[in-house]
C-alpha cells in the first residue's frame, strides 16, 4: 500500500510540475531560472520515487539476449528464405510468412486463418470463389511469434499439443509421438514441422499433391518428400552447405536442418528485449511516461493482471478455463461424434480442461 500512496503522490506532484512549466514558459529570465530549478527537482523526484517503486512492486526481471535460444546468423539467414518460400507447401502456393506477417504482428489479423488455397494476406485474405473456394478455414488463429524463442517456453499452440517432455523418449510431446525426427534444436524447430503436413494450413487437399497423401497415411513419410524438394534445388543445397558443418552434399540435408533454420530465423527476427519497460527494469527510472507508470501500477496492483500475466514473458504457461462458450467452428477432436472444440482436453484427456 505504501508503494501505491507514493505513486499517487507522484502523479499529483507531476501534475503540479506540468502546470508550473506551462505557466512559466516564455516569461522573464527570473522565472525561466525558477522553471529550470523546477525541472531539476522534478527529475530527482521522479528518479527517487521510481527507484523506490521498483523495490516495492513485484516486477519481473528484464529480458536479455541470453534468455533466448542461440540463433546462428548463417542458419537464420537461410531460415528467412525458407520461411517466405512456398516450396514447403503441398501445392507450393503458401509460405509460413503468409500467415505470420510482419504487418500484422507476426500473425495474420484474422480470427480464423485462411491457409492453403486462399488469396492475399492479412485481414484481406479471402477463401476464393466458386469451384476454387477452399473447403475449410484453419480451425484456430495463427499464433504471434514474438519471444517464442525464449528458453523458458515449454509449451506451444492453443491446446498445448507441443511441449517439452520425454514421454516418447525424444524430448518432446507432439502429434508425431515417437515418429518425431531426431536432432531438433528446440521447441520452435519442432513446431515448424507440423504446418507443412496439415491439410488446411499448408499441405492441401487429398489428391492434389503427394505431401498430403503421405502425411495422412504416416506423418513421418511426408517430411522426406518435402526435404527432397530442397535437395533438388541447387541454390538451397549450396546455402545449406554454407550454414551447416555436417552437410557436404544434397544427400546430407534432412528435415531437421530445414526446421532448425526456420527456428533460428524466428528466434532472431521476433525477439523483443529492448522495450522501454525492459529499460525501466534495468534501472532507467525515466524510461516510462507518467501514464505508463499508472498502467504499470494497475497491472501489478489492484487490477491483478500479473496474477496470470506474470514473469518476463507475461505468462505462466498454464491453461485456464475462462468460462467462455465456444464460438466459431474450432477444431473437432479425432473420433469425437460431436462437432465441438474441446480445447486443452484434446491433449490432456482431463474433463476439467474442456
Model-predicted segments: where are they?
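Hydrophobic transmembrane signal anchors and adjacent membrane-proximal interface regions, especially
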Residues: 5-7, 44-46, 56, 164
Amino acid at each position: 500500500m505504501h508503494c501505491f500512496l507514493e505513486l499517487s503522490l507522484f502523479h499529483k506532484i507531476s501534475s503540479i510540475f506540468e502546470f508550473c512549466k506551462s505557466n512559466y514558459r516564455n516569461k522573464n529570465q527570473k522565472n525561466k531560472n525558477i522553471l529550470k530549478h523546477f525541472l531539476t527537482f522534478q527529475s530527482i523526484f521522479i528518479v527517487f520515487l521510481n527507484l523506490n517503486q521498483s523495490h516495492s512492486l513485484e516486477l519481473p526481471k528484464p529480458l536479455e539476449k541470453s534468455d533466448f535460444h542461440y540463433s546462428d546468423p548463417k542458419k537464420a539467414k537461410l531460415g528467412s528464405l525458407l520461411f517466405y518460400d512456398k516450396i514447403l507447401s503441398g501445392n507450393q502456393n503458401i509460405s509460413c510468412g503468409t500467415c505470420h506477417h510482419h504487418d500484422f504482428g507476426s500473425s495474420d489479423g484474422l480470427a480464423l486463418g485462411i491457409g492453403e488455397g486462399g488469396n492475399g494476406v492479412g485481414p484481406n485474405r479471402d477463401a476464393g470463389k466458386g469451384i476454387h473456394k477452399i473447403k475449410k478455414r484453419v480451425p484456430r488463429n495463427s499464433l504471434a511469434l514474438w519471444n517464442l524463442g525464449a528458453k523458458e517456453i515449454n509449451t506451444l499452440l492453443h491446446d498445448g499439443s507441443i511441449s517439452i517432455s520425454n514421454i516418447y523418449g525424444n524430448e518432446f510431446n507432439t502429434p508425431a509421438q515417437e515418429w518425431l525426427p531426431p536432432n531438433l534444436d528446440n521447441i520452435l524447430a519442432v513446431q515448424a514441422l507440423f504446418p507443412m503436413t496439415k491439410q488446411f494450413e499448408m499441405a492441401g487437399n487429398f489428391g492434389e499433391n503427394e505431401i498430403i497423401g503421405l502425411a495422412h497415411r504416416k506423418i513421418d513419410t511426408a517430411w522426406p518428400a518435402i526435404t527432397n524438394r530442397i535437395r533438388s534445388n541447387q541454390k538451397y543445397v549450396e546455402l545449406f552447405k554454407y550454414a551447416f558443418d555436417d552437410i557436404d552434399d544434397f544427400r546430407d540435408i534432412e528435415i531437421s536442418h530445414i526446421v532448425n533454420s526456420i527456428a533460428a530465423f524466428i528466434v532472431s527476427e521476433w525477439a523483443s528485449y529492448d522495450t522501454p519497460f525492459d529499460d525501466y527494469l534495468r534501472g532507467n527510472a525515466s524510461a516510462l511516461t507518467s501514464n505508463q507508470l499508472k498502467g504499470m501500477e494497475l497491472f501489478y496492483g489492484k487490477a491483478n493482471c500479473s496474477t496470470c500475466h506474470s514473469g518476463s514473458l507475461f505468462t505462466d504457461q498454464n491453461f485456464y478455463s475462462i468460462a467462455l462458450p465456444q464460438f466459431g467452428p474450432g477444431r473437432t477432436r479425432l473420433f469425437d461424434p460431436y462437432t465441438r472444440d474441446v480445447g486443452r482436453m484434446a491433449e490432456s484427456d482431463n474433463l476439467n480442461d474442456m
